[in-house]
Amino acid sequence: MQEMKPVKEGKVREIYDNGDSLIMVATDRISCFDVILNNEVTKKGTVLTQMSKFWFDMTQDILPNHMISVDVKDMPEFFQQDKFDGNSMMCRKLDMIPVECIVRGYITGSGWASYQKNGTVCGITLPEGLKESDKLPEPIYTPSTKAEIGDHDENISFEQSVTHLEKYYPGHGQEYAEKIRDYTIALYKKCAEYALSKGIIIADTKFECGLDENGNIVIGDEMLTPDSSRFWPADGYEPGHGQPSFDKQFARDWLKANPDNDWTLPQEIVDKTIDKYLQAYEMLTGEKLK
């Protein structure tokens, strides 16, 4: 069996070059505040991969995606080890567009902080009188630039995203900025409506898009996972304050409350975190994680 080494390691994912495709492995690492924690969260990588597959399958009518297979039998022999089973995805190679596509359907997090200051989020003026966690009249698109590991992503306005993309794709900045905005809002709307029918509010989420060899826009990376999205239980939803969520919030809250944490979580917080991930997966897909 030929040993393979990742060509790129992100905070959570490892990417392997498989010639005309990539193998994307979601590890059990967890990152908060752009820092990789010392803990691993068992099964987290499998939740991320299988949930992305679920949404990719559901949304091909809106936008094609980069997924080829999540079956390790379709991958080189190196990936036919237990540690890769379930958390690995074979993908098409894309030229990734250097903008994170954030769609917000509810006002929370950094969006709420910005609104409190001046009534806007990423240059978009919102109605007066919104409360924390309120549903927005329409989902808004608030792009950000993609940071290297250790840096923070920077929120930008739509106009700034046009200028930013024009540098990479001369003559196509406006076109690509508009397309990724319109596609990702459409993806969010379809998936948020479905999720609500299963008892989950998708408050906001981050998509990443790329160009295939023919210059078509394709959805890449992960899609609508607890790592890239805020999932709230619809049961008990009440604007006016923060909401409980099916994601890393347990971990974030504990780290904030314990500033001397040296980036290590107690096991109880790790267990609560994976419970939330599994609960979201089961509610959305109607299946238990294999």
Spans of features found by a protein language model:
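Coil-to-beta-strand transition motifs
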Residues: 21, 96-98, 198-202, 214-217
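Intrinsically disordered, low-complexity acidic/polar segments
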Residues: 33, 112-113, 214, 228-230
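Generic recognition of stable, solvent-exposed alpha-helical segments in well-folded globular domains
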Residues: 46, 50, 175, 179-182, ...
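Conserved metal-phosphate-binding beta-hairpin within the catalytic cores
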Residues: 103, 202-223
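A long amphipathic alpha-helix within ATP-dependent nucleotide-binding catalytic cores
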Residues: 171-203
